[in-house]
């Protein structure tokens, strides 16, 4: 029986994509600050994600290559559905889940490859606080997490950035990098096709007229002389031979490589000279546990942190060779000590990042009266 003294009404707000923009989803300087807080909370342990260890990236639905049932989708590149739930503590103390479907064929319909929705919940009652259009939420937090690496690991006077794979992810990463290193004045771009690369270059020129933008023909040209290198190429069906290759000899002393996607490094350099940083070690450990030792990083995602965790299991790296960016930001682990060190920063992406940024945007929306209020119930029918 419902206690008449209790207010049982539950309302939540819906935020469309234009309303998310109005609420500040694209404020990358602020988003970098929020991601830094989030990564510190991760390193301190004030979070929960899915899975046995609380570190899972999420739960994924894949499809068979040749479905036996009419209407069932068939497997294809980036063809999946995924739910990514998490709780984040600190000043946030909220819980949420990002849910998305992905299909490269969407491009033919003038739609994004993946379409995202986010639900933010009260961590005490479980009641929904907000339902959000989440493509921009996901894109900007994805750019801001590498931005935390730029803040703590890039040389102070960084001037030149090289991009391999100038898609949406690389654009938001570059935008976030500029908030942390306004000294950047040169950008080199290497893409897969001339047409899409030139379109990307034009986007950068219009967005950042103060930056000199150059299209280059090879990965080597994009890497050589760059203070910051962004690898934004999705996993190749050709395996490692199709991944961007960051050859040791091409890397400028002091370079920072941001690797949120498939990338290939020289193992001997990784084990001897490079400084290795990850967004969170627990994520890569859980990926390894979920997929088993027979699924190598090449088959999984191609993200360098997966390869480094394989090497930890092989004994060619020690776990202590990997540093959490949150521990560096928290002052517990030494960051850059000189302008010669080369850093590799692997970013896998985690739902805690969506939850924290969504919480900030929800609070902005409420304070500004943005969004549509929807009612779940006044009094629950079943209680």
Tell where the protein language model's regions lie, with residue ranges.
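N-terminal ligand-binding/catalytic initiation module
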Residues: 1-139, 145-147, 157, 352-355, ...
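Adenosine-phosphate binding glycine-rich loop
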Residues: 17-25, 263-264, 268-381
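Short internal alpha-helix immediately C-terminal to a glycine-rich phosphate-binding loop
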Residues: 141-162, 168-182
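NAD(P)-binding Rossmann-fold cofactor-contacting core
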Residues: 180-207
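Short, conserved loop/helix-junction motifs that constitute active-site signature segments
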Residues: 181-182, 245-253, 268-272
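Short acidic low-complexity segments
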Residues: 211-226
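Rossmann-fold NAD(P) dinucleotide-binding segment
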Residues: 224-225, 236-256
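Short glycine-/small-residue-rich Rossmann-like dinucleotide-binding loops
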Residues: 233-237, 261-262, 281
């Amino acid at each position: 029986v419902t206690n008449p003294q209790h207010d049982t009404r539950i309302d939540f707000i819906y935020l469309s994509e234009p309303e998310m923009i109005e609420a500040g989803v694209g404020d990358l300087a602020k988003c970098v600050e929020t991601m830094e807080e989030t990564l510190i909370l991760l390193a301190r342990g004030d979070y929960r994600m899915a899975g046995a260890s609380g570190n899972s990236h999420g739960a994924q639905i894949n499809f068979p290559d040749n479905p036996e049932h009419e209407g069932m989708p068939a497997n294809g590149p980036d063809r999946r559905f995924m739910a990514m739930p998490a709780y984040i503590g600190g000043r946030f103390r909220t819980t949420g889940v990002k849910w998305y479907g992905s299909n490269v064929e969407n491009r033919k319909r003038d739609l994004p490859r993946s379409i995202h929705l986010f639900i933010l919940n009260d961590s005490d009652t479980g009641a929904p606080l907000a339902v959000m259009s989440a493509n921009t939420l996901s894109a900007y937090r994805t750019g801001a997490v590498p931005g935390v690496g730029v803040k703590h690991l890039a040389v102070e006077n960084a001037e030149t950035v090289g991009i391999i794979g100038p898609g949406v992810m690389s654009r938001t990463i570059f935008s976030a990098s500029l908030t942390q290193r306004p000294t950047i004045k040169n950008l080199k771009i290497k893409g897969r096709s001339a047409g899409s690369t030139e379109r990307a270059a034009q986007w950068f020129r219009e967005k950042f007229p103060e930056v000199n933008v150059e299209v280059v023909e090879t990965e080597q040209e994009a890497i050589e002389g760059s203070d910051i290198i962004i690898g934004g190429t999705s996993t190749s069906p050709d395996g490692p031979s199709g991944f961007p290759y960051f050859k040791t000899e091409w890397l400028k002393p002091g370079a920072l490589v941001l690797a949120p996607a498939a990338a290939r490094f020289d193992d001997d350099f990784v084990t001897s000279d490079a400084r290795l940083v990850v967004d969170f070690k627990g994520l890569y450990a859980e990926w390894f546990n979920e997929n088993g030792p027979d699924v190598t990083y090449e088959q999984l995602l191609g993200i360098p942190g997966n390869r480094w965790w394989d090497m930890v299991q092989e004994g060619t790296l020690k776990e202590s060779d990997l540093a959490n960016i949150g521990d560096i930001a928290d002052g517990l682990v030494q960051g850059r000590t000189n302008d010669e060190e080369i850093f590799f920063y692997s970013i896998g992406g985690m739902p805690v990042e969506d939850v924290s940024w969504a919480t900030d945007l929800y609070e902005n929306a409420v304070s500004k009266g943005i969004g549509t209020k929807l009612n779940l119930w006044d009094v629950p029918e079943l209680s």
